């Protein structure tokens, strides 16, 4: 749903710094990455490699591990920042480390500009986005990472889309969880787990799955 477009140099630098770090993470053999993934999936659910969500789930995990992991050595992004001598790359790393995951409703967007309303925190953002969001309609709900860099808010690398038409049900669920005192991170994990459920129960209306979040469903019948 997202295609690459030629952006400004700030966009290129921001994403290149993250891609370089993700590439380094792929060479990790300490067991830290595997342990972090297990913890991540305990919170959000385990996706199988043959499922459609495998790629966005994995990319979202890498972003979380790189910039939010609280292991003994701290987040890999923080470790990279400590050794970075280039001031522009260091600024980009700091922006990633200050970024936050968000569950947003997409507004009516124009080329390069995407309005996004954060359901968990209530904030409204005007996001600078050079990539084309094919098939994304106003009112769609997406989990994204919001990054403030060089005076602009930008999306991260990963987009986890929720089914079209589920926005009202998701907002109801988010309000219910906020009323229970749940944190934004807890709400994000919960709603992501519901998104995974829509893949496992394709014979069930997604709206029902979001509205009946605590309802026990039978095993998928393949229908």
Question: What role is predicted for each listed range?
Answer:
Residues 10, 18-30, 155-158, 168-223:
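C-terminal effector modules of nucleic-acid-centric enzymes and ribosome-associated factors
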Residues 112-116:
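Short aromatic-glycine-enriched beta-strand elements
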Residues 145-152, 161:
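Short, charged beta-turn/beta-strand-edge "cap" motif at the junction between a beta-strand
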Residues 23-104:
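Accessory interdomain/linker segments of ATP-dependent helicases and helicase-like nucleic-acid enzymes
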Residues 104-106, 144:
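Small-residue-enriched segments and motifs
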Residues 108-110:
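A residue-level detector for short acidic-glycine micro-motifs
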């Amino acid at each position: 749903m997202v295609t690459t477009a030629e952006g400004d140099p700030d966009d290129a630098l921001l994403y290149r710094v993250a891609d370089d770090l993700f590439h380094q993470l792929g060479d990790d053999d300490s067991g830290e990455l595997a342990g972090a993934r297990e913890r991540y999936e305990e919170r959000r659910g385990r996706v199988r490699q043959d499922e459609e969500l495998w790629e966005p789930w994995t990319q979202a995990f890498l972003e979380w591990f790189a910039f939010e992991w609280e292991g003994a050595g701290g987040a890999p992004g923080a470790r990279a920042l400590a050794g970075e001598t280039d001031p522009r790359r260091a600024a980009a790393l700091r922006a990633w480390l200050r970024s936050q995951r968000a569950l947003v409703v997409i507004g009516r967007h124009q080329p390069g500009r995407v309005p996004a309303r954060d359901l968990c925190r209530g904030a409204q953002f005007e996001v600078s986005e050079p990539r084309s969001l094919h098939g994304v309609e106003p009112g769609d709900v997406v989990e994204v990472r919001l990054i403030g860099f060089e005076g602009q808010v930008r999306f991260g690398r990963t987009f986890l889309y929720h089914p079209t038409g589920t926005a009202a049900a998701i907002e109801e669920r988010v309000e219910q969880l906020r009323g229970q005192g749940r944190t934004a991170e807890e709400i994000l994990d919960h709603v992501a787990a519901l998104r995974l459920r829509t893949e496992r129960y394709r014979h069930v209306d997604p709206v029902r799955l979001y509205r009946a979040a605590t309802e026990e469903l039978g095993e998928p019948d393949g229908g």
